[in-house]
Every structure is written in structure tokens, then in C-alpha cells.
Amino acid sequence: MKDLVPMLISTVLGTLVGWERQMGRKPAGLRTHTLVCLGSTLFVLLTEHAVREFGGPSLDPTRIIHGVVTGVGFLGAGSILRQEGYVHGLTTAASIWMVAAIGTAVGVHSYGLAIISTVLALLVLEGYRWVERWLTPGDDSNG
């Protein structure tokens, strides 16, 4: 039951980032970001359980973090498209990678770090949009 708190926190934080992407009609939105964040948390929590249950010198819990980063990299790569000289989806790929990191932070019970990272991610995703528009007027290819 103690795992319910990190799972709920992860769901909320992933949803916040996913909502921003959904409102911008980006390739990966609410469900994708929420599930990636939640899945990352679950993998870390499962590793914690495995170490407690089967612990030993050969069981390295940091390997799961490596696996999450690698797996999410493939998912993010699927959101990147190149079309007519423009590359689309890089920001969405980065946000997928970011929610995996947020979910991992929640999984290791670093809730403050996860919340601060979510706030900063939202500031970058939403706040930098006006900076990009100011720097490149008439160019809607950002994000």
C-alpha cells in the first residue's frame, strides 16, 4: 500500500506535462506522458522490491534506471519526424524523456526533486514558447 503514494504522485506529475503537450496538439499527449511517468516509477519500485526480496551483490538497482532511459529513448525517437527540411517532434521527444526522469525521481522517493523538475519542465515548455515566437516571428515550426 505504501507504493500507492508514489504511483499517484507520478500520475499527477506526468498528467501535468502531458496536458501541456495535449493542449498544443503535439504527437504525444496526456496518456503517453502519464503512462511513461507512471511506468518509470513502477520499474523503480519493482527494483526496490526485488532488492529487498532477492538482494545480493549481483543485483544492481541502478541498472533499471539505465533501462528506463534506453527504452524511453526509443519511444521518443518515434515522435521525431523530418519533413520538407524541417524536423518536428524534438520537444515532444525531450518531454517524454523528461517525464521518464520525473517518474524515476518519484520512484526513488525524491518527491521534491520530481515536483521541482515538473514545474521547470512546464516553464520551459510553455514559457519558452513566447520567447521562440519573439525571436522567430512568423515561424510556427517550434515545439
Which residue ranges define each predicted feature?
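Short, amphipathic, aromatic/basic-enriched membrane-interface segments that mark the entry/exit
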Residues: P61, I80-T91
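Interfacial segments of multi-pass membrane proteins
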Residues: R21, A93-S110
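Hydrophobic transmembrane alpha-helices of multi-pass small-molecule transporters
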Residues: F74, V99-A100, L125-E126
